[in-house]
UniProtKB/Swiss-Prot annotation:
Pathway membership: Cofactor biosynthesis; molybdopterin biosynthesis
Keywords: Lyase, Molybdenum cofactor biosynthesis
Active site: 126
Similarity comment text for this entry: Belongs to the MoaC family.
Species per Swiss-Prot/TrEMBL record: Herpetosiphon aurantiacus (strain ATCC 23779 / DSM 785 / 114-95)
Keyword Cell inner membrane part of the UniProt annotation: no
CDD domains reported for this sequence: MoaC_PE (cd01420)
Name of this protein: Cyclic pyranopterin monophosphate synthase
Length: 164
């Protein structure tokens, strides 16, 4: 059953008023694949547009806070924490973005985590596209989530081998 449709098939916001208030956490991931030279410049902080990684972290945090403004029918949530980690994986020529979002509330924070990772990836693309137009944003997904009536979730995808 699709919970965002009423009995007449019209879209509506799900009523979460009767759900228990619990601790919620979700992690999402996005990878940005690029040319090795681009990754080197980015990690060294030598791209013309400035500190790409710091800007991407801020953009991801801002995006998580604005999720309900951008995703129809998404509940506005009182986020207690948004963290953005960006890891370089030279062997795969990519940056991996992992967002972690927490709140105490009646509904999960998966969309906020996905929004944070996605916008951080888009920011990296925007700031590095002058030197690498062939970048690819890939592997955007919820890694895990905790809290709520449906219990915990761990995505079955195996993380990339990070050995160099």
């Amino acid at each position: 059953m699709l919970t965002h449709l009423d009995d007449q098939g019209r879209a509506h916001m799900v009523d979460v008023g009767d759900k228990a208030v619990t601790q919620r956490q979700a992690q999402a991931q996005a990878d940005v694949r690029m040319q090795p030279a681009t990754l080197d410049l980015l990690v060294a902080g030598e791209l013309p547009k400035g500190d790409v990684l710091a800007t991407a972290r801020i953009a991801g945090i801002m995006a998580a806070k604005r999720t309900a403004d951008l995703i129809p029918l998404c509940h506005p949530l009182p986020l207690s924490s948004v963290a953005i980690e960006i890891e370089a994986h030279p062997a795969q020529s990519l940056l991996r973005i992992i967002s972690t979002v927490r709140c105490t509330g009646r509904t999960g924070v998966e969309m906020e985590a996905l929004m944070a990772a996605s916008v951080a990836a888009l920011t990296i693309y925007d700031m590095a596209k002058a030197v690498d137009r062939a970048m690819v944003i890939e592997q955007v997904f919820v890694r895990n989530k905790t809290g709520g009536a449906r219990g915990d979730f761990q995505h079955p995808l195996t993380p990339l081998d990070t050995s160099e």
